[in-house]
Amino acid sequence: MLNSKGKYCSICTLVLVCTLIAGCDNPAKNAPADDLKVVIIRHAEKPVAGDNLSCQGQNRALQLPAILAKKFIKPDYTYVPALKSDKSTAHSRMFQTVTPLAVKYDLTINSKYRQNEYADVAKSVLKKNGVVLMVWSHSEMPDLVRALGVDNAPKWADEDFDSIWLVTYANGKATLAADNQGLKPATNCSF
């Protein structure tokens, strides 16, 4: 027979066990929101040598806010890979591509994750609601979309700066659709 102290401990233990069981990984609880849209683009055009955008790439970056707003509304979040600051600034093109959009809509650019930290960046993105824009390197995109839940991710063509990938979710399942920006930016810098 339990005394009142023993009953109290038994009840506390039961409550703790029930709480732990209820808090265990529930796939529905951890599934991405059905309103999540992940828009993925490659950085804009680059010069033959160097880490920055070319004039054509800068012109594309300046035109992107209008194009993306027309197609998807403005993003709620933006992600680019972390900048490297060694002898060069690798990944600066992604930052330069998204900057006009971030300025126009007063968005924070999340650059916390390295280019190949697919699982970590996907974990962060999949917790969001709304529209997430990711500007990434084309060679990394198949791994990136696989981390976002897409099964058969195609390669992104080396010469393609115009495509848009859109990952949407329904009942926790990811679907990848392709679109394009439809831009043909000028190759000269007018500034």
Each predicted region: which residue ranges?
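Active-site-proximal alpha-helix that buttresses catalytic centers in soluble enzyme cores
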Residues: 26-129, 140-191
